Amino acid sequence: QRFYVIGMTDDQSCTFSAEILQLMGRGKVFSGGKRHHEIVASLLPEDAVWIDITVPLDKVFSQYEAYAEIIVFASGDPLFFGFANTLKKRLPNAWMRVYPVFNSLQTLAHRLVLPYHDMRTVSLTGRPWQNLDEALIRGDKLIGALTDREKTPSRIAARMLEYGYDNYRMTVGVHLGNKQAEEVHTLSLDEVIGREFGFPNCLILEQTYQRERLFGIPESSFHLLDGREKMITKSPIRLQALSMLDLHQKHTFWDIGFCTGSVSIEAKLQFPHLQIHAFECRPEGETLINLNTRKFGTPGIEYHIGDFMELDLSDLPAPDAVFIGGHGGQLTEMLQKIDRYLLPGGCMVFNSVSENSLHLFREGIKAIGRCIENEIGITVESYNSITIIKAI
């Protein structure tokens, strides 16, 4: 199959090069969104076949099977989070030529006369928050985001402020390239909340000041369980455990027995690319992790309240790093359960507070056919010595 993928703007009077007009003139089968069809309909041959690109896409590609050559219209640059990428994934052996125009974020930057060579681009179009969360935590100074009807500018602004990211201003571009409907608004995040914008739209976030990004958060800074500092992993131990987990190289992290969420929060701040799932049996943990993630600006940590041994984990992404901060007297059984999900090359780190739990961990690791890679003993002030032990 051969595909010609033509990028276009949202302008009703959209113009095309002579090469593209010649291509359209001899084309037989065309495809694109309903808006694209409205704009180009008068330029197509009378006997043209048109295939609407709508979800589910399986039906679209089923129709494509009947034709050897298809001309596809897409918005902006079809290779920028666009339909050309979908074609490449679905039909990797198909021949393709792309005719791009400026994508929407480029166009918005042009309207602002804003250099965008170092802009971090994220797509929220049918996608989770992960990439935007990562950009905010990293402190990227310029972020361009593609929106959809669910993740609107208002909802994005509200979520940013919920987690303390008031250090950006937002510019929203609406119907960019459409001479009759285009709008550009630069606003504070507070001004964006509750405001409705025409669709399609996109936005650029410009950092107004550098937000503090902590490393080694003091225990006293967290909201604590009944005010008890002894119930939180101490900063030196927390950082050593995270170091032994080697999270630079990992993708999915499970934090078992999160209590205040300190380990998950520290991990998210230093390794914002991680998918983190945190587990806690105490109901109070829900309030604590909600308070602390918002205090320290760590959106995206998924938490699960209940006995880890009774939770159904089958729908969660399998971990390649696991921290055990609490085991409720079921350490041996917990290791067996973790072993069923831990990806090849993954590791576990356990903070042992007693000789008995250290012995149980060693024996439990041996029983599941794994081995101890490293262990370090640390004593903080007048607290009991902790052994941080890693298994692979």
Per-region residue spans from a language model:
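Class I SAM-dependent methyltransferase SAM-binding "motif I" and its flanking Rossmann-like core
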Residues: T9-Q12, L79-G139, M309, H359-V380, ...
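Conserved SAM-binding loop of SAM-dependent methyltransferases across substrates and taxa
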Residues: T260-P272
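A short glycine-rich, Lys/Arg-flanked "PGG" loop and its adjoining helix->strand segment in the class I
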Residues: L335-C347
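Conserved beta-strand signature within the Rossmann-like core of class I S-adenosyl-L-methionine
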Residues: G345-V353, S357
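Conserved class I S-adenosyl-L-methionine
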Residues: K250-C259
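A contiguous loop/helix-start segment that scaffolds small-molecule binding in enzyme catalytic cores
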Residues: Q1-I6, A18-E19, E69-I70, D140-K230
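Class I S-adenosyl-L-methionine
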Residues: Q1-R97, Q106, H273-I276, E280-R282, ...
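Conserved SAM-binding loop
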Residues: I289-N292
